[in-house]
Amino acid sequence: MKALAKLKKQPGIWMIDDAPIPEYGYNDVLIKIKKTAICGTDLHIYNWDKWSQNTIPVPMITGHEFAGEVVAKGDGVTSVDIGDRVSGEGHLVCGQCRNCRAGKRHLCRKTIGIGVNVQGAFAEYLVMPAVNVFKIPDSISDDIASTFDPMGNAIHTALSFNLTGEDVLITGAGPIGLMAVKIARFCGARRIVITDINEYRLQMARDFGATVALNVAPFKNQDELVKQMRKVMSDIGMTEGFDIGLEMSGINSAISMMLDVMNHGGKLSLLGISAGDISVDWGAILFKGLTLKGIYGREMFETWYLMTSMLQAGMDMNPIITHRLHIDEFQKGFEIMKSGQCGKVILDWSS
């Protein structure tokens, strides 16, 4: 089968035509891939950064955001049928630890990821345990379903705390941050402010309903950044700090600024992964009585039900997809992702 694989311990990703079709077991399904989306994780693997060097076995078929069709299944599978349109949870869990048995599978200590630790979705076929498969409702397109993984991250982050009527600060306007703008607006947030240094994506955030999308690139230090943020808050009629913070950047200066402008009793969901250690004002956390929640992946499968229900109720995520390419143009897709001048990039695996 055709697949995209990390074949060498250097930057790049390569197309192969002779990858074996994976074998499925008693409780597995075989999925024919129709659409995949390029994730920031895939870009890290492409660039072969320090995280990738320490994490990714080579060779490895990568990718974990997908939509496809079930074409075969093991004898033990009763939850899906051949012909079903599906996406799937890319975190594979043990099912036996305390968290798994308590229904908190997203907190499994033994989690492994498709396209990271085991064969991924950038291939014509993917094998996945049936318990990880999620049926796509007829009203949702394959393109949108292929973005369920990052959309689920955004849902989990944004809906960890009640957004309705609240003032929300989002740091980081990558695709997940942009999705969070859509979610916060759909759920009735009062004011939504988002920060980033990428003007293309900040304009997308404005189009998605952000009250203010602030380009923080011009500010030379933390004091200037906080001063400008307080001006923004005043300009839009805020008399207190932000109620909810959604941290999507993993950038120390963004996190420090967020802590500075949160209201007393504010709540923060932290999704952004830092490349190094983070230094924060511990006193601000204590004396403001802030609540911080780390976010990893999606709640299985409450997050999935929430996002499909919200899409069916009218939340429009189609504008997050800015580029659609055939799989033979995958190099162009990765170049677009590296440029940052995009939302989600979809790869079509049809013949």
Swiss-Prot record:
* Record-linked NCBIfam families: PRK05396.1, tdh
Q: How is the cofactor bound?
A: Binds 2 Zn(2+) ions per subunit.
EC class of the enzyme, as a word: oxidoreductase
What is the protein's given name?
Answer: L-threonine 3-dehydrogenase
Q: What does this protein do?
A: Catalyzes the NAD(+)-dependent oxidation of L-threonine to 2-amino-3-ketobutyrate.
- Residues that bind Zn(2+) 2, according to the entry? C94, C97, C100, C108
* Cofactor entry: Zn(2+)
Q: Which organism is it from?
A: Francisella tularensis subsp. novicida (strain U112)
Q: Which residues are the signal sequence here?
A: none
List the taxonomic lineage.
Bacteria, Pseudomonadati, Pseudomonadota, Gammaproteobacteria, Thiotrichales
Binding residues for NAD(+) = I176, D196, R201, L271, G272, I273, I295, Y296
| The encoding gene | tdh
Tell me the domain of life.
Bacteria
